[in-house]
């Protein structure tokens, strides 16, 4: 199959990477697993056993007229412990390499079908200036875009750093979440070739 390149001849690419069927279930599973792996999982609350304080019975069992109480660290008391206290945990999910690659290829194929993949000969700017990058994107009628290059361009990276709807990645740093998060994905010819090699 061929991909149209802006201002250049069409690029012949592999059908297995850019022409796969859309597998929604696989993409969903991989995206959920990727997001789960990004969770910090460090929250921690104290049970009644871990709260600092005296173990003395606050008042005698009978005769005061108050409700019976045996511990100031009881979960029903203010400043007491938490009944089912949250503890640090690892939320990561196992995803087989074959599944991950399949999801990436399925996403790339769907981007092609929806005309959301924009292939360019090269994508560079002369200086690390946000204004320059904004103008370049404006000339291409783009406002919300992920830019993928073969190797990380420092000028592009610095210029895009404070643009909310623009991100710059090299091929090694692409992931399923970033690929589906933007309206358009701008990718250079060299990056397309690298992607084919990586996910062949």
From Swiss-Prot:
Keyword annotations: Ribonucleoprotein, Ribosomal protein, RNA-binding, rRNA-binding
GO CC term (a single one): ribonucleoprotein complex
Any one GO MF annotation of this record: structural constituent of ribosome
The keyword Ribosomal protein appears for this protein: yes
Functional summary from the UniProt entry: One of the primary rRNA binding proteins, this protein initially binds near the 5'-end of the 23S rRNA. It is important during the early stages of 50S assembly. It makes multiple contacts with different domains of the 23S rRNA in the assembled 50S subunit and ribosome. Forms part of the polypeptide exit tunnel.
HAMAP family: Ribosomal_uL4_B
Record text on subunit structure and interactions: Part of the 50S ribosomal subunit.
PANTHER family attached to this UniProt entry: 50S RIBOSOMAL PROTEIN L4, LARGE RIBOSOMAL SUBUNIT PROTEIN UL4M
Protein name: Large ribosomal subunit protein uL4
Organism name: Histophilus somni (strain 129Pt) (Haemophilus somnus)
């Amino acid at each position: 199959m061929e991909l149209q390149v802006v201002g250049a001849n069409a690029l012949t690419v592999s059908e297995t990477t850019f022409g796969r069927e859309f597998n929604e279930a696989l993409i969903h599973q991989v995206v959920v697993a990727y997001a789960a792996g990004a969770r910090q999982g460090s929250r921690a609350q104290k049970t009644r056993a871990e709260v600092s304080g005296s173990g003395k019975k606050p008042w005698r069992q009978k005769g005061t007229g108050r409700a019976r109480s045996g511990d100031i660290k009881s979960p029903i008391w203010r400043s007491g412990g938490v009944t089912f206290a949250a503890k640090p945990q690892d939320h990561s999910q196992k995803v087989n390499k074959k599944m991950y690659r399949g999801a990436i290829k399925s996403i790339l194929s769907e981007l092609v079908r929806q005309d959301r993949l924009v292939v360019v000969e090269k994508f560079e700017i002369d200086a690390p200036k946000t204004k320059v990058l904004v103008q370049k994107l404006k000339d291409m009628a783009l406002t919300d875009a992920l830019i993928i290059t073969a190797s990380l361009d420092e000028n592009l990276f610095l210029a895009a750093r404070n643009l909310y709807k623009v991100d710059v990645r090299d091929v090694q740093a692409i992931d399923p979440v970033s690929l589906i998060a933007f309206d358009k994905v701008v990718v250079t010819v060299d990056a397309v070739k690298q992607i084919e090699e990586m996910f062949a």
